[in-house]
Amino acid sequence: MGRYAKEPDNPAKSCKARGSNLRVHFKNTRETALAIKRMPLRRAQKFLKNVCEKKECVPFRRFNGGVGRCAQAKHWNTSVGRWPKKSAEFLLQLLKNAEANADYRGLDVDRLVVDHIQVNRAPCLRRRTYRAHGRINPYMSSPCHIELSLTEKEDVVTKAAENEPAKKKLSKKKLQRQKEKMMRNE
């Protein structure tokens, strides 16, 4: 078992899964993984299935050169998006694996959240393509390593309201004016 980039804060309430040297594009997978980060497990699975069916798009934020625009990206406050089906399928398999690990450890599957997900480049695989005039060009693939951890979300406890009303926050300019008024009155 290898070392993960980020260990969970509470190992008893979390589970992990990873895949190495996966034959899926690094750039597409990185953008897809970033989209599901901090999502609840069920929502992340539904999102990835919708991406495969082209009902929701993945926003492309960093690797967006030459990527076309789509209306579905408005949901993410951007205009650039795609539907990387193969990346979504690989991530779905990893989420399924992590869910099985959580079930084995006795965690509540409905309260799991994607706490950490990271995509790293794997060594490129080299093939060749034949060109005109007897030349040969490289035909590379960019596989990746994926690791993720799911954490059981804790109950949110609301803070008790105090009897004192909250003080209104004043800007520096208004505070200065109040001080000047007090100085004039004295």
Swiss-Prot record:
Originating species: Aedes aegypti (Yellowfever mosquito)
Cellular component GO terms held in the UniProt record: cytosolic large ribosomal subunit
Keywords: Ribonucleoprotein, Ribosomal protein
Compositionally biased spans, kind Basic and acidic residues: 177-186
GO molecular function per UniProt: structural constituent of ribosome
GO biological process, one term: cytoplasmic translation
Stored PANTHER family: 60S RIBOSOMAL PROTEIN L17
Region named Disordered: 160-186
Gene: RpL17
Name assigned to this protein: Large ribosomal subunit protein uL22
